[in-house]
Swiss-Prot record:
Organism of provenance: Prochlorococcus marinus (strain NATL1A)
Top-rank lineage group of the source organism: Bacteria
Protein's recorded name: Putative membrane protein insertion efficiency factor
Described purpose of this protein according to its UniProt entry: Could be involved in insertion of integral membrane proteins into the membrane.
Keyword tags: Cell inner membrane, Cell membrane, Membrane
Amino acid sequence: MLTKINKAIALVFVSLISFYQKWISPLFGPSCRFIPSCSAYGIEAVNKHGPWRGGWLTLKRLSKCHPFTPCGCDPVPEK
């Protein structure tokens, strides 16, 4: 169970990712190699696993999103 502090941190993370999706991502066009996109993955990971594990999973995912990695489906792991 998430504590109030963890819930607040998760809200900040999700808000930052949502800001990126709405205001920054449209400037560059679609570039993610995966389904779901890295930003959608980040929101789902934080909502499903909390801010710390979800944040870690998101960082791992972002590190794989480059031209030398095969593209495809990479869902958020279950708990």
